Amino acid sequence: MYCILVAGMPASGKSTIAVRISESLGIPMLSKDSIKEVLFDDLGFHSRAEKVQLGTAAMHILYYAAAQLMKAGKPFILENNFEDASIPGIMALLETHHYTAVTVRLTGDPEVIYRRFAARDLSDTRHRGHVVNDCYPEPPGAPQENPTRKSYEQFLDDNAARGYTRFQANGPVLEVDVTDLSELDFPRLMGSLTGFCTEGSSWISSATAHTKCIIPDRK
């Protein structure tokens, strides 16, 4: 059985792509950030350390839910900032339940993605729990905390150190250029995914399981 991991650097469009894949394939999608938002709203936090604990709890919940789907033999999608540190946990889950993961790894022009990253926390649609670090919910009447923005160099260094753009699991990688999401050739992406994910396909046990496929922008 298969699952799909949607990975990539922050603000690359993982949630948007994961939702579209989920709707196209008719399979469930689990998002760590969505779980974190529920924990932010239900439990809140009063320090950076407490916020980090909620992030850790969200990861445990994500993997628990994935394990239940695996026990039922269901295909599904996980969306997360997968990084080098994620590999032991996800690989253990895949091996325990005999699943193979297709990694959809989002990439593109880092300057463009950085601009999306810098603008995201200023958006009214961004959950404030992701933005603030000291306290959430924010006390009534308190001045709104502004995000401490990483420089472009810090953004690049963090991506390189954490391995967002090199993550892969135990199956093939579809590397997708998301520099301009409006120009993404989504039907081509879905054609590639459908071919990989057809039950019984030979890629699961083939020697080409780690071949990188480039899905470029539609021109």
Regions found by a protein language model. Name each.
Residues 97-119:
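Conserved phosphate-donor/acceptor-positioning beta-strand/loop module used by diverse small-molecule
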